[in-house]
Amino acid sequence: MSLIHPDTAKYPFKFEPFLRQEYSFSLDPDRPICEFYNSREGPKSCPRGPLCPKKHVLPIFQNKIVCRHWLRGLCKKNDQCEYLHEYNLRKMPECVFFSKNGYCTQSPDCQYLHIDPASKIPKCENYEMGFCPLGSSCPRRHIKKVFCQRYMTGFCPLGKDECDMEHPQFIIPDEGSKLRIKRDDEINTRKMDEEKERRLNAIINGEV
């Protein structure tokens, strides 16, 4: 014990239970999980209820992003909060400023996620099947993938789920999307008709 860091544990206050219950005051975030708490029955499943010193984890607790209010010390929901009370960089909320402007004034010290806008563009279904007629002007995303040589030659022992390369799916095109290749005689006939029409127009206009 010292004047700079006095030992205050032996001086309890009557309002401490209220602070722990309402604001999780002085509760260790790394405290163990309560073995009596049942997420289906709620706080009543634990004999100590909201006064329990251990953590009551909800089933949706680990599947959400980090709570914005908790990051600032302003969340009042405690363990009942539907967002994550944990500093996890992979589950941080998206930076609103970066998503709107394409840059962040707090970078590289920003605590929120900077998500590439291109990753939000939906995939092009035509490109996924093998060919997109719009090419580079397509508004959807074209993701380049390397085809599995073993699959292309007939068989891949790893299968689609475990193979790191792409296994293209053979899709039979619709009748309306089939390409028709003209014969040479059809092409030559069209050229002859165009030549005749050009000569006729020249005669009419007095160019010959």
From Swiss-Prot:
Zn-finger region bounds: C3H1-type: 28-59, 61-88, 89-117, 118-145, 147-170
A single BP term in Gene Ontology: mRNA processing
SMART domains listed in its UniProt record: ZnF_C3H1
The entry's keywords: Metal-binding, mRNA processing, Nucleus, Repeat, RNA-binding, Zinc, Zinc-finger
UniProt xrefs under Pfam families: zf-CCCH, zf-CCCH_2
Any further remark recorded for this protein: Present with 3690 molecules/cell in log phase SD medium.
Protein family membership: Belongs to the CPSF4/YTH1 family.
Protein name: mRNA 3'-end-processing protein YTH1
Upper lineage: Eukaryota, Fungi, Dikarya, Ascomycota, Saccharomycotina
Primary gene name: YTH1
